[in-house]
Amino acid sequence: MIAMSNMDDELEEIRKRRLAEIQRQQAQQQPSDVQAAYQQEQARAEMEAQKQAILRQILTPEARERLTTLKMSRPALGEQLEMQLISLAQSGRLKAQIDDEQLKTLLMRMQPKKRKTSITRV
């Protein structure tokens, strides 16, 4: 019985040391994870600010309003349109600000043609 008791005590001691080691490792990793997440969030916010600054330069207020509305209803399409507009601006293919009508035209070109399907009963 005494031998079993010693083994149980040793096993318990090993478990405690291992648990303490794991907790120590997690405590060391946690600040770096938090810091990395903070830096990533900062970079994302900075990129978003740059994107908004470019869009302010190339879109009229009405077009910006339409783009904002589009992003609320269809985020993927709004992001795609933003990236296309920024690409056009950076490549120098935009000569003047894009107004609401031009933005509508660009949106129509981006969206695939919808087929009209009708069901008729015979």
UniProtKB/Swiss-Prot annotation:
GO cellular component term, pick one: cytosol
Keyword vocabulary terms for this entry: DNA-binding
Region of interest: Disordered: 22-42
SUPFAM superfamilies: Double-stranded DNA-binding domain
Signal peptide: none
Pfam families: dsDNA_bind
InterPro entries: DNA_bind_arc, PDCD5-like, PDCD5-like_sf
Superkingdom classification of source: Archaea
GO molecular function: DNA binding
Similarity annotation: Belongs to the PDCD5 family.
Protein name in the entry: DNA-binding protein MA_4116
Origin species: Methanosarcina acetivorans (strain ATCC 35395 / DSM 2834 / JCM 12185 / C2A)
Upper classification of the organism: Archaea, Methanobacteriati, Methanobacteriota, Stenosarchaea group, Methanomicrobia
